[in-house]
Swiss-Prot record:
Organism (species): Lactococcus lactis subsp. lactis (strain IL1403) (Streptococcus lactis)
Entry protein name: 6,7-dimethyl-8-ribityllumazine synthase
Keyword Transferase (UniProt): yes
Lineage: Bacteria, Bacillati, Bacillota, Bacilli, Lactobacillales
A Pfam family reported for this protein in Swiss-Prot or TrEMBL: DMRL_synthase
Residue numbers annotated as active site: H88 (proton donor)
Amino acid sequence: MTIIEGNLRTENAKYGIVVAQFNEFINAKLLSGALDALKRHGVQEEEIDIAWVPGAFEIPIIAQKMATSNKYEAIICLGTVIRGSTSHYDFVCNEVSKGIAHVSLNSNIPVMFGVLTTENIEQAIERAGTKAGNKGFEVAVGAIEMVDLMRKIG
């Protein structure tokens, strides 16, 4: 039996990050966490490209554009969708998650889901660097592991 796992090491890998502008005060913290994780694990600034999109709904199309450009070994998607008083939240969350999964499966590169889907602003703040950690950091660590794992599998 062979067990294959990704390690937290990457050399000469380029990462694309897609960040939503809507809820930017939270998403900027997610981005900061992601950049911190990448840099702590040896990724150089010139190996990172960041694309800002208007909102979470626009993340998949730019993730797809990046993924199919053959420039990146992983795409990190960051955004925040907070439940409001209408069903808009459910539609956005469902379509963004499906879109990101679709991009990953069709491009054959890791496209990491770092979109917070929360009931309220307090939950979003907690997940962007306070009591519940920083999901941007966690997703970037996952991206590094996935790049290494994909390389090992070939």
